């Protein structure tokens, strides 16, 4: 077993060796390096064929038509293109958008930008388990609502939203439905032939593909129109100009192909490992799981260890790579806005650790992690005056702290 142990697969994944090998065939002069938009020679034709094959693999995994896949630089761009593109195209119908407070920043900040442009956004509060109240969503819908954007799986707490039910509500009101599926594609079965989803964002690097490439599913039936953000040569049916990075697209396609083959056996394996981790940690006193355990991705565990400061716990756990909050915002010392939206107080939100498991996680690594966390929590609580007060039965909420 090698240290440090990587348990931050929701932040990114290593590129699968099979994917890297495939990508190498599309880079050098010995390989297939052509521009897929070059229609006048073999180099271009071969590159175009490689892109088509990859596009089919991606469509196959999610039950879509390959013509519905638009390549982007990643899920952040896909979120931007979906939300801004739809808002700008359909603004004559209305300027109201609905999303949730626990969405990824790529969705929330895009909505904030649209607010600056005169759109109105309703931010739904999740329930304490992280799930959305469908009645609340229904009540938030108005005649001028043009778009609902709700993620499939939350990146911090792994909670799975009922996108089938949300899709039905949206379709009944003729409102476009965008799903950020960055954390769910390849980990949960998704069939867009059945789901009433109009737009769906996807990433490659959360699925053992390369960084810097992603895709947006844009429904053809019913047809969804978008206003482009990036203009140029009119690539990707005019929705996203720019020379296609063939090696990255091939990598993403191969990663999605592998996931389709291995998902049925891989997810139960990860669930067993995640449950082993949970069972090893749940008996630590004052430990709380954040988000629904029932409606949750099999590879995610987000736990708060009360009376332990999150950053010091991260330092004590330097032999394992975990995170507090998402990678995109973990550089700030603010407590996770996702956990705050669930109603956690600052202390509990600050003491949360996200463990996310993946393809290379082993049983040995999980057992090592359990022991390490147990010892670290015990050690840090020994140093904590708050823990002593709690053990003495003092209600910390009744104490008035002096502010310096």
UniProtKB/Swiss-Prot annotation:
Keywords linked to the UniProt accession: 2Fe-2S, Cytoplasm, Iron, Iron-sulfur, Metal-binding, Pyridoxal phosphate, Transferase
Active-site residue numbers: 328 (cysteine persulfide intermediate)
Biological processes per GO annotation: [2Fe-2S] cluster assembly
Pfam families assigned to the protein according to its UniProt record, in alphabetical order: Aminotran_5
Any single Gene Ontology cellular-component annotation: L-cysteine desulfurase complex
Catalysed reaction equations from the record: (sulfur carrier)-H + L-cysteine = (sulfur carrier)-SH + L-alanine
Residues reported to bind pyridoxal 5'-phosphate: 75-76, 155, 183, 203-205, 243
Intracellular or extracellular location(s): Cytoplasm
GO molecular function terms listed in the Swiss-Prot or TrEMBL record: 2 iron, 2 sulfur cluster binding; cysteine desulfurase activity; metal ion binding; pyridoxal phosphate binding
Cofactors named for this entry: pyridoxal 5'-phosphate
Chain positions recorded as [2Fe-2S] cluster binding sites: 328
UniProt main location, coarse: cytoplasm
Stated family: Belongs to the class-V pyridoxal-phosphate-dependent aminotransferase family. NifS/IscS subfamily.
Entry-linked HAMAP family: Cys_desulf_IscS (MF_00331)
Designated name of the protein: Cysteine desulfurase IscS
Annotated source species: Pasteurella multocida (strain Pm70)
């Amino acid at each position: 077993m090698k240290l440090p142990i990587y348990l931050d697969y929701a932040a990114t994944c290593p590129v699968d060796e099979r994917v890297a090998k495939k990508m190498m065939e599309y880079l050098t002069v010995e390989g297939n390096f052509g521009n897929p938009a070059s229609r006048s020679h073999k180099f271009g034709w071969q590159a175009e064929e490689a892109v088509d094959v990859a596009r089919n693999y991606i469509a196959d995994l999610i039950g879509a038509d390959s013509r519905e896949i638009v390549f982007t630089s990643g899920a952040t761009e896909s979120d931007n293109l979906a939300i801004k593109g739809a808002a700008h195209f359909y603004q004559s119908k209305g300027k109201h958008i609905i999303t949730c407070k626990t969405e990824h920043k790529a969705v929330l900040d895009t909505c904030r930008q649209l607010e600056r442009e005169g759109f109105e956004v309703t931010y739904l509060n999740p329930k304490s388990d992280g799930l959305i109240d469908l009645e609340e969503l229904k009540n938030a819908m108005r005649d001028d609502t043009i778009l609902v954007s709700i993620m499939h799986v939350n990146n911090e707490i792994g909670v799975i939203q009922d996108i089938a039910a949300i899709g039905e509500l949206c379709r009944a009101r003729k409102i476009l439905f965008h799903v950020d599926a960055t954390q769910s594609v390849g980990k949960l079965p998704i069939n867009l032939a059945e789901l009433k989803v109009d737009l769906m964002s996807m990433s490659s690097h959360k699925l053992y593909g390369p960084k810097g490439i992603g895709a947006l599913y844009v429904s053809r039936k019913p047809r969804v129109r978008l206003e482009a953000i990036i203009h140029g040569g009119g690539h990707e049916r005019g929705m996203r100009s720019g020379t296609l990075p063939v090696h990255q697209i091939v990598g993403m396609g191969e990663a999605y192909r592998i996931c389709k083959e291995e998902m049925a056996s891989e997810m139960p394996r990860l669930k067993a490992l995640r449950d082993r981790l949970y069972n090893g940690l749940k008996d630590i006193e004052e430990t709380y799981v954040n988000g629904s355990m029932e409606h949750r991705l099999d590879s995610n565990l987000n736990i708060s260890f009360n009376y332990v400061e999150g950053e010091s716990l991260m330092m004590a756990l330097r032999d394992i790579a975990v995170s507090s909050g998402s990678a995109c915002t973990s550089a700030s010392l603010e407590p996770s806005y996702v956990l705050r939206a669930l109603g956690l107080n600052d202390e509990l939100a600050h003491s949360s650790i996200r463990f996310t498991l993946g393809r290379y996680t082993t049983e040995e690594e999980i057992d090592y992690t359990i022991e390490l966390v147990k010892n670290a929590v015990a050690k840090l609580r020994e140093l904590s005056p708050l823990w002593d007060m709690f053990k003495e039965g003092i209600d910390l909420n009744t104490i008035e702290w002096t502010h310096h």
